[in-house]
Amino acid sequence: MPQLDTSTWFTVILSMIISLFMLLQLKISSHSFYLDPKTMSLKTTKHNLPWENKWTKTYLPLSLHLH
């Protein structure tokens, strides 16, 4: 059974890592980022809900009888 020739593995792996790094750098450099981001002021809105203005009755279950 012949032995596996691993003499070129270092060159192949190193060139692959370098090319992936270059490709990643090109992908990242193509994106445009905002230079001066401004904070947005968030305004809270008050919702008028009908159950906030009046009390609601709470009923006991039918199985509980108070005498």
From Swiss-Prot:
Topological relation to the membrane, as annotated: Single-pass membrane protein
Localization terms from the record: Mitochondrion membrane
InterPro entries according to UniProt: ATP8_mammal (IPR039017), ATP8_metazoa (IPR001421)
Modified residues (N6-succinyllysine): K54
Cellular component aspect of the GO annotation: mitochondrial membrane; proton-transporting ATP synthase complex
Subunit note: Component of the ATP synthase complex composed at least of ATP5F1A/subunit alpha, ATP5F1B/subunit beta, ATP5MC1/subunit c (homooctomer), MT-ATP6/subunit a, MT-ATP8/subunit 8, ATP5ME/subunit e, ATP5MF/subunit f, ATP5MG/subunit g, ATP5MK/subunit k, ATP5MJ/subunit j, ATP5F1C/subunit gamma, ATP5F1D/subunit delta, ATP5F1E/subunit epsilon, ATP5PF/subunit F6, ATP5PB/subunit b, ATP5PD/subunit d, ATP5PO/subunit OSCP.
Similarity section: Belongs to the ATPase protein 8 family.
Name of the protein in its database record: ATP synthase F(0) complex subunit 8
